[in-house]
């Protein structure tokens, strides 16, 4: 199975669930950028202190800082496979990530795109019961996702890395479809 992966997909497609399962089953390291940022802050590293300062001001952490944290994490893996989730979110970030991965001799082997009809996504997200998840907010999140992510999807499609997977059905059925395209 391919060992260096990116996960893309709309909110509610099951990226977190599938990432955890695949990483557990195949010994991959799950690199969620949100989790990585929180871990760096918690550890009190220089990168974490910089990230904390930015987040405390209510600002977005810069791409360069996220890339530095990703680079530090990947550099410490000693050849272990990985699954990057939550980054890159746009083509500019992807174009910044690619040379970093080449430098580490860890290029992306596959980009998994979890696809699901909007109606099913809305149903899934509403069933989570989160306060901020009403249908209007969810529909807007899906529009924003499509606008921001379509060029990124095309970027990886043109590079021959994109693997689309239908994200409907049972968790196990989806996992098997993902494993099938990564074999």
From Swiss-Prot:
Q: Does the keyword Phosphoprotein apply?
A: no
Q: Name one GO molecular function term.
A: adenylate kinase activity
Renumbered residue ranges of the record's region LID: 127-133
- Provide the alphabetized UniProt keywords: ATP-binding, Cytoplasm, Kinase, Nucleotide biosynthesis, Nucleotide-binding, Transferase
Q: Write down the chemical reaction(s) this protein catalyses.
A: AMP + ATP = 2 ADP
The processes (GO biological process) annotated in the record are:
AMP salvage
Q: Where is this region: NMP?
A: 32-61
| Regions annotated as coiled coil | none
Q: Which residues bind AMP?
A: 33, 38, 59-61, 86-89, 93, 130, 141
EC code(s) of this entry: 2.7.4.3
Outline the subunit composition.
Monomer.
Q: What does this protein do?
A: Catalyzes the reversible transfer of the terminal phosphate group between ATP and AMP. Plays an important role in cellular energy homeostasis and in adenine nucleotide metabolism.
- Put simply, this protein is called Adenylate kinase
| Source organism of this protein record | Synechococcus sp. (strain CC9311)
